[in-house]
Protein backbone atom coordinates (compact mmCIF):
# COMPACT_ATOMS: atom_id res chain seq x y z
CA UNK A 1 0.00 0.00 0.00
CA UNK A 2 2.92 2.34 0.72
CA UNK A 3 4.31 1.84 -2.80
CA UNK A 4 0.89 2.54 -4.28
CA UNK A 5 0.59 5.71 -2.22
CA UNK A 6 4.05 6.76 -3.46
CA UNK A 7 3.00 6.15 -7.06
CA UNK A 8 -0.07 8.32 -6.59
CA UNK A 9 2.19 11.05 -5.26
CA UNK A 10 4.55 10.56 -8.19
CA UNK A 11 1.69 10.84 -10.66
CA UNK A 12 0.72 14.17 -9.12
CA UNK A 13 4.37 15.24 -9.02
CA UNK A 14 4.88 14.34 -12.68
CA UNK A 15 1.75 16.26 -13.59
CA UNK A 16 2.96 19.29 -11.65
CA UNK A 17 6.44 19.08 -13.23
CA UNK A 18 4.92 18.84 -16.71
CA UNK A 19 2.79 21.91 -16.03
CA UNK A 20 5.81 23.76 -14.58
CA UNK A 21 7.87 22.89 -17.67
CA UNK A 22 5.05 24.10 -19.92
CA UNK A 23 4.88 27.36 -17.96
CA UNK A 24 8.68 27.78 -18.22
CA UNK A 25 8.54 27.20 -21.98
CA UNK A 26 5.76 29.77 -22.31
CA UNK A 27 7.73 32.23 -20.19
CA UNK A 28 10.79 31.79 -22.41
CA UNK A 29 8.70 32.74 -25.46
CA UNK A 30 7.07 35.76 -23.82
CA UNK A 31 7.87 39.41 -24.52
CA UNK A 32 10.39 41.41 -22.51
CA UNK A 33 7.62 43.44 -20.88
CA UNK A 34 4.82 40.99 -20.24
CA UNK A 35 1.48 42.07 -18.93
CA UNK A 36 0.57 40.87 -15.49
CA UNK A 37 -1.98 38.10 -15.45
CA UNK A 38 -4.85 38.44 -13.02
CA UNK A 39 -4.33 36.55 -9.79
CA UNK A 40 -6.05 33.21 -9.75
CA UNK A 41 -6.81 31.18 -6.70
CA UNK A 42 -5.52 27.66 -7.10
CA UNK A 43 -7.35 24.82 -5.47
CA UNK A 44 -5.02 21.82 -5.68
CA UNK A 45 -7.72 19.41 -4.55
CA UNK A 46 -9.82 20.43 -7.58
CA UNK A 47 -6.81 19.87 -9.83
CA UNK A 48 -6.09 16.48 -8.28
CA UNK A 49 -9.70 15.34 -8.52
CA UNK A 50 -10.11 16.38 -12.13
CA UNK A 51 -6.66 15.61 -13.51
CA UNK A 52 -7.30 11.90 -13.97
CA UNK A 53 -10.80 12.14 -15.42
CA UNK A 54 -10.84 10.26 -18.73
CA UNK A 55 -7.41 8.73 -18.09
CA UNK A 56 -6.27 5.15 -18.54
CA UNK A 57 -3.57 3.30 -16.62
CA UNK A 58 -2.03 0.30 -18.39
CA UNK A 59 0.56 -1.98 -16.90
CA UNK A 60 1.80 -4.48 -14.40
CA UNK A 61 1.11 -5.14 -10.72
CA UNK A 62 1.65 -1.47 -9.81
CA UNK A 63 -1.41 -0.56 -11.88
CA UNK A 64 -3.27 -3.55 -10.47
CA UNK A 65 -2.53 -2.28 -6.96
CA UNK A 66 -3.64 1.25 -7.82
CA UNK A 67 -6.91 -0.19 -9.09
CA UNK A 68 -7.45 -2.41 -6.05
CA UNK A 69 -6.83 0.46 -3.63
CA UNK A 70 -8.82 2.99 -5.73
CA UNK A 71 -5.96 5.46 -5.42
CA UNK A 72 -6.81 7.46 -8.51
CA UNK A 73 -10.48 8.21 -9.02
CA UNK A 74 -11.92 8.87 -12.45
CA UNK A 75 -9.47 6.64 -14.33
CA UNK A 76 -9.80 3.29 -16.05
CA UNK A 77 -7.32 0.53 -15.24
CA UNK A 78 -6.08 -2.19 -17.58
CA UNK A 79 -3.64 -4.36 -15.68
CA UNK A 80 -2.50 -7.85 -14.93
CA UNK A 81 -0.04 -9.06 -12.32
CA UNK A 82 3.20 -10.01 -14.07
CA UNK A 83 2.24 -8.18 -17.28
CA UNK A 84 5.09 -7.21 -19.61
CA UNK A 85 5.14 -5.27 -22.88
CA UNK A 86 4.91 -8.46 -24.93
CA UNK A 87 1.99 -9.93 -22.99
CA UNK A 88 0.07 -6.64 -23.17
CA UNK A 89 -0.41 -7.35 -26.89
CA UNK A 90 -1.76 -10.87 -26.37
CA UNK A 91 -3.07 -11.40 -22.82
CA UNK A 92 -6.19 -9.95 -21.24
CA UNK A 93 -6.62 -8.35 -17.85
CA UNK A 94 -7.62 -10.76 -15.10
CA UNK A 95 -11.28 -9.98 -15.81
CA UNK A 96 -11.12 -9.09 -19.51
CA UNK A 97 -11.54 -10.99 -22.73
CA UNK A 98 -9.33 -9.00 -25.13
CA UNK A 99 -5.60 -8.25 -25.00
CA UNK A 100 -4.79 -5.45 -22.55
CA UNK A 101 -3.80 -2.96 -25.26
CA UNK A 102 -7.09 -3.62 -27.09
CA UNK A 103 -8.93 -2.25 -24.04
CA UNK A 104 -8.03 1.22 -25.35
CA UNK A 105 -10.22 0.52 -28.38
CA UNK A 106 -13.37 0.54 -26.24
CA UNK A 107 -15.10 3.56 -27.78
CA UNK A 108 -14.06 5.89 -24.96
CA UNK A 109 -11.76 8.83 -25.69
CA UNK A 110 -9.01 9.19 -23.07
CA UNK A 111 -7.19 12.44 -22.38
CA UNK A 112 -4.17 10.74 -20.82
CA UNK A 113 -2.70 7.25 -20.90
CA UNK A 114 -0.22 6.21 -18.21
CA UNK A 115 1.91 3.18 -19.12
CA UNK A 116 3.81 1.35 -16.38
CA UNK A 117 6.13 -1.36 -17.66
CA UNK A 118 9.72 -2.46 -17.24
CA UNK A 119 10.08 -4.22 -13.92
CA UNK A 120 8.97 -7.59 -15.28
CA UNK A 121 11.33 -7.16 -18.23
CA UNK A 122 14.51 -6.48 -16.21
CA UNK A 123 15.69 -10.07 -16.62
CA UNK A 124 15.19 -10.23 -20.38
CA UNK A 125 18.32 -11.31 -22.25
CA UNK A 126 18.00 -8.52 -24.81
CA UNK A 127 17.00 -5.00 -23.80
CA UNK A 128 16.52 -4.12 -27.49
CA UNK A 129 13.54 -6.50 -27.53
CA UNK A 130 12.05 -4.58 -24.59
CA UNK A 131 12.45 -1.25 -26.41
CA UNK A 132 11.07 -2.64 -29.67
CA UNK A 133 8.01 -4.21 -28.05
CA UNK A 134 7.34 -1.21 -25.82
CA UNK A 135 7.53 0.97 -28.92
CA UNK A 136 4.99 -1.25 -30.69
CA UNK A 137 2.72 -0.99 -27.66
CA UNK A 138 2.94 2.81 -27.73
CA UNK A 139 2.18 2.84 -31.47
CA UNK A 140 -0.89 0.67 -30.88
CA UNK A 141 -2.06 2.97 -28.07
CA UNK A 142 -1.64 5.98 -30.37
CA UNK A 143 -3.62 4.25 -33.12
CA UNK A 144 -6.58 3.80 -30.76
CA UNK A 145 -6.25 7.06 -28.84
CA UNK A 146 -4.66 9.55 -31.24
CA UNK A 147 -5.40 12.63 -29.14
CA UNK A 148 -4.39 11.23 -25.74
CA UNK A 149 -1.21 12.37 -24.05
CA UNK A 150 0.88 9.30 -23.22
CA UNK A 151 3.14 9.02 -20.18
CA UNK A 152 5.78 6.30 -19.72
CA UNK A 153 6.63 5.77 -16.06
CA UNK A 154 10.17 5.07 -14.94
CA UNK A 155 10.74 1.91 -12.95
CA UNK A 156 10.87 2.64 -9.23
CA UNK A 157 13.94 1.55 -7.25
CA UNK A 158 13.99 -1.56 -5.10
CA UNK A 159 15.29 -1.88 -1.56
CA UNK A 160 19.01 -2.27 -0.97
CA UNK A 161 18.43 -5.86 0.15
CA UNK A 162 16.62 -6.79 -3.06
CA UNK A 163 19.15 -4.93 -5.17
CA UNK A 164 22.08 -6.64 -3.43
CA UNK A 165 20.54 -10.08 -3.96
CA UNK A 166 20.24 -9.28 -7.70
CA UNK A 167 17.32 -11.64 -8.25
CA UNK A 168 16.52 -11.80 -12.00
CA UNK A 169 18.48 -8.57 -12.55
CA UNK A 170 16.05 -6.75 -10.27
CA UNK A 171 18.66 -4.38 -8.95
CA UNK A 172 18.94 -0.63 -8.96
CA UNK A 173 21.82 -0.61 -11.45
CA UNK A 174 19.70 -2.50 -14.00
CA UNK A 175 16.69 -0.32 -13.21
CA UNK A 176 18.71 2.82 -13.96
CA UNK A 177 19.77 1.32 -17.32
CA UNK A 178 16.19 0.43 -18.23
CA UNK A 179 14.95 3.85 -17.14
CA UNK A 180 17.41 5.42 -19.58
CA UNK A 181 15.98 3.17 -22.32
CA UNK A 182 12.44 4.21 -21.38
CA UNK A 183 13.45 7.88 -21.41
CA UNK A 184 15.01 7.60 -24.88
CA UNK A 185 11.99 5.67 -26.14
CA UNK A 186 9.66 8.38 -24.83
CA UNK A 187 11.70 11.02 -26.65
CA UNK A 188 11.70 9.06 -29.91
CA UNK A 189 7.93 8.43 -29.74
CA UNK A 190 7.04 11.99 -28.72
CA UNK A 191 5.51 10.96 -25.41
CA UNK A 192 6.22 12.04 -21.83
CA UNK A 193 8.81 10.29 -19.65
CA UNK A 194 7.62 10.33 -16.03
CA UNK A 195 10.72 10.05 -13.85
CA UNK A 196 9.38 8.49 -10.67
CA UNK A 197 12.71 6.85 -9.76
Residue ranges and their predicted role:
Residues 9-54:
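N-terminal, intrinsically disordered, polar/charged segments of Gram-positive cell-envelope systems
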Residues 120, 142-175:
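Active-site segments of SGNH/GDSL-like serine hydrolases
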Residues 43-133:
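Conserved SGNH/GDSL esterase-like catalytic core that processes O-acyl groups on lipids
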Residues 51-54, 108-113, 145-150, 188-192:
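Loop/turn elements at helix/coil->beta-strand transitions in domains of secreted/extracellular proteins
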Residues 128-137, 175-178:
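Charged helix-capping and loop-helix junction motifs
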Residues 67, 118, 135, 139-146, ...:
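Sec-exported extracytoplasmic/periplasmic mature domains
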Residues 160-196:
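Substrate-gating cap/lid alpha-helix
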Residues 1-8:
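Hydrophobic membrane-insertion alpha-helices, especially the h-region
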Amino acid sequence: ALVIFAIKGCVSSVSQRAEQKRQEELAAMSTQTPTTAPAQKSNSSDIDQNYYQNSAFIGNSFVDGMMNYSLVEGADYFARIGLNVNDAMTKSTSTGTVPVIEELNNGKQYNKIFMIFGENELGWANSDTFVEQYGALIDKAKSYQSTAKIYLFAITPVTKEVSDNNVDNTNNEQIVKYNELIKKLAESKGVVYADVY
